[in-house]
């Protein structure tokens, strides 16, 4: 009887946790989509200063010269 009670309580906790996380995930996804629709991507043309590839319009940043190529 004790084993059945433990299994039942574990199943209830897992079901509650799964339902709760699904609700939060949908809310986060909607919020993230709203933010992304407001943002515009700004990029640096070739020859401009950069620190990472995603800053360059052509998505290539030279690590040696720290410029977009």
Swiss-Prot record:
Main subcellular localisation: secreted
Statement: the UniProt record of this protein carries the keyword Chloroplast: no
Expressed in which tissues: Expressed by the venom duct.
Keyword flag Disulfide bond: yes
Listed GO CC annotations: extracellular region
Coiled coil stretches, renumbered: none
Signal sequence annotation: 1-17
InterPro entries hit by this protein: Conotoxin
Propeptide stretches in the record: 18-41
Residue pairs linked by disulfide bridges in the UniProt entry: 43-57, 50-61, 56-68
Localisation per UniProt entry: Secreted
Keyword tags: Disulfide bond, Knottin, Secreted, Signal, Toxin
Recorded superkingdom: Eukaryota
GO molecular function: ion channel inhibitor activity; toxin activity
Record-stated family: Belongs to the conotoxin O1 superfamily.
Entry text on domains: The presence of a 'disulfide through disulfide knot' structurally defines this protein as a knottin. The cysteine framework is VI/VII (C-C-CC-C-C).
Misc. comment: This precursor corresponds to allele E1b. Has not been merged with other alleles since they may differ due to geographic variation (see strains in PubMed:19606224).
Protein's UniProt name: Conotoxin Eb6.14
Taxonomic lineage of the native organism: Eukaryota, Metazoa, Spiralia, Lophotrochozoa, Mollusca
């Amino acid at each position: 009887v004790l084993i059945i009670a433990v299994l039942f309580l574990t199943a209830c906790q897992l079901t509650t946790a799964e339902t709760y996380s699904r609700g939060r995930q949908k809310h986060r996804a909607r919020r993230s989509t709203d933010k992304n629709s407001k943002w515009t991507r700004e990029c640096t043309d070739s020859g401009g200063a950069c620190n990472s590839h995603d800053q360059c319009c052509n998505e290539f940043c030279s690590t040696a010269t720290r410029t977009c190529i």
